[in-house]
Amino acid sequence: MAAFSMEPMGAEPMALGSPTSPKPSAGAQFLPGFLLGDIPTPVTPQQRPSIGVMEMRSPLLSGGSPPQPVVPTHKDKSGAPPVRSIYDDIASPGLGSTPLNPRKTASFSVLHTPLSGVIPSSPECKNISGSRKRPASSVFSPATIGHSRKTTLSPAQMDPFYTQGDALTSDDQLDDTWVTVFGFPQASASYILLQFAQYGNIIKHVMSNNGNWMHIQYQSKLQARKALSKDGRIFGESIMIGVKPCIDKSVMEATEKVSTPTVSSVFTPPVKNIGTPTQSVGTPRAASMRPLAATYKTPASADYQVVADKQAPRKDESIVSKAMEYMFGW
């Protein structure tokens, strides 16, 4: 009776759980075949997607070979994925453990190779940074930049006529109040001088005898810079003027020799008004100022004197006035 009652109970769950599987043996009535290690039959259509999913996920998750029972079943099938090519990418030498690393390395080297100009031997950052520094130092070296600046700002290049710059050296100090105006005809020299007189006080100007330029000295460096900003301006709708810093040392030296005794004679005060004339040479403004103590002293030879008026009202100091002040508060 016990054996008779167990047969229908064992046959009913097998018929409901796996209808397509073959009839199980008597020893494995309550357990499915995949738990006991049985190889599934290739005829069942439900096992094909499960095998394909296991084969595609196994290289990415574990990185090892798939289970032995699965490999012989999908090699004979036409719908199985190319497992061999996936394993070749993982086991290739010099790359990472996952197939994503060779893609990153290749893109990294492709992106950085045009910048450096040299193909690095390994995808390390040190080699790429080193190869990047080499062309930068050769192209944009500080020595090259300094050399180009020096050539652009040299006095020979600033000279519009390229004749006076050869006599200058690097130790020469030029006067920044001098400018050279050029590009005008001889008939318009006075007109151009009048136009440049609007930018500052002109101390001296030297005209060229046969050329189309003149040297102008302003009172301050700020006025000279204002005149330099008019380089390339058109005057009279037909004359374009160029303005450059003056580098003609002969004009500056001649002006200094002439103006040196004149300046000393102008700023030398008379000896009669000041007791120490040596201090007034260095400070000409202090020589013309009066000492502060002189305002509080009235000299005997002054033109104006304060005379005390005898008829000025004064306070009465008599006894009666004092008594009235005490009593009435006056």
Swiss-Prot record:
Which is a GO BP term held by this UniProt record? protein transport
| InterPro entries named in the record | Nucleoporin_NUP53, Nucleotide-bd_a/b_plait_sf, RBD_domain_sf, RRM_NUP35_dom
Pfam families for the chain: RRM_Nup35
Q: Name one GO cellular component term.
A: nuclear pore
Keyword field: mRNA transport, Nuclear pore complex, Nucleus, Protein transport, Translocation, Transport
Where does the UniProt annotation locate this protein? Nucleus, Nuclear pore complex
Going by the entry's taxonomy, the superkingdom of the source organism is recorded as: Eukaryota
Q: Where is the RRM Nup35-type domain?
A: 173-253
Report whether Lyase shows up as a keyword of the record.
no
Protein's UniProt keywords contain Nucleus: yes
GO molecular function annotation: nucleic acid binding; structural constituent of nuclear pore
Q: Which residues cross the membrane?
A: none
The record's CDD domains line, in alphabetical order, gives: RRM_Nup53
Q: What protein family does this chain belong to?
A: Belongs to the Nup35 family.
Give the protein's function.
Functions as a component of the nuclear pore complex (NPC). NPC components, collectively referred to as nucleoporins (NUPs), can play the role of both NPC structural components and of docking or interaction partners for transiently associated nuclear transport factors.
Name of the protein in its database record: Nucleoporin NUP35
Origin organism is: Xenopus tropicalis
Q: Gene of origin?
A: nup35
